């Protein structure tokens, strides 16, 4: 197993292993490194969806995403983060399913709209592009750690309202039509703005701009200004690793201490096919 650093504050790559055939010692080592480095890139992994699911289940149960149009028809645990349908055709720009996925171009944390958000995500790049479509990952431990002490005191007991419907409101195309899937069936949830990781016990900012409606019990305009400040602070280059995809890269990240986004690409002409499994969270976020 060959381990290489990808960024001074976040991310490693691991080569020389086969994710479809891991012994327990290697898996336990990967799990330990994941908690330490937050993001792991596994290059050259020509795995099937079944292999992908099997690897994900070694970390725990897997989510089934509420969006019906993005689930694999064969394996519902596979979330198709793709601008291509299951017949291999590019999804038209105005289609609901693409407009929903386009919101991943915003910074976010997977499943922040759930009462118990996900522990992590594992993404397989099946057909990638070198013309955009890179994924950015931010270290939210470090972003919190570097805040001035006065700001830490200001935000440590604050809570944020997250709502899945907020994703819909960000797109005119989604807002004006009856949406597919179960978009409207999830109630808003409230999460701490600063959370403690259940395994590492470290504190981090918990931000997810595509679902964050407001700070709970806080002046709306002041709350939005504060959230915007924290977002901009967290996405400075010193906290962010940019992953430039190659076909058959597998990337996993810890949603409890990272935030991520996708760089835009020409979705009308380029096929970007990505499959994700998402690790079900095992407890509500802990206030730091």
How would you name each of these model-derived features?
Residues 2-252, 256-288:
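Fe(II)/2-oxoglutarate oxygenase catalytic core
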């Amino acid at each position: 197993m060959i381990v290489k650093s990808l960024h001074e504050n976040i991310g490693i790559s691991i080569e020389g292993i086969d994710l479809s055939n891991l012994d327990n010692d290697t898996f336990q080592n990967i799990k330990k490194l994941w908690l330490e480095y937050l993001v792991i890139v596994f290059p050259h992994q020509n795995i099937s969806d079944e292999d992908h699911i099997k690897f994900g289940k070694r970390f725990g149960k897997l989510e089934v995403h509420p969006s019906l149009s993005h689930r694999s028809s064969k394996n519902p645990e596979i979330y198709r983060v793709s601008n291509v349908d299951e017949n291999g055709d590019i999804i038209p720009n105005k289609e609901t399913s693409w407009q929903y996925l386009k919101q991943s171009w915003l910074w976010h944390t997977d499943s922040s709209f759930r009462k118990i958000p996900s522990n992590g995500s594992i993404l397989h790049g099946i057909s990638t592009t070198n013309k955009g479509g890179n994924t950015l990952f931010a270290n939210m431990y470090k972003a919190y750690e570097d805040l001035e002490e006065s700001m830490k005191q200001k935000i440590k007991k604050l809570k944020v309202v997250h709502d899945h419907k907020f994703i819909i409101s960000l797109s005119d195309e989604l807002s004006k039509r009856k949406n597919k899937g179960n978009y409207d069936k999830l109630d808003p949830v409230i999460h701490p703005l600063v959370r403690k990781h259940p395994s590492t016990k470290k504190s981090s900012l918990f931000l997810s701009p595509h679902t964050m409606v407001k700070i709970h019990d806080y002046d709306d305009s002041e709350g939005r200004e504060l959230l915007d400040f924290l977002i901009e602070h967290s996405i400075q280059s010193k906290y962010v690793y940019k992953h430039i995809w190659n076909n058959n890269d597998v990337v996993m990240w810890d949603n409890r201490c990272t935030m991520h986004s996708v760089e835009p690409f020409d979705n009308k002409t380029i096929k970007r096919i990505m499959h994700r499994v998402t690790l079900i969270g095992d407890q509500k976020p802990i206030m730091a």
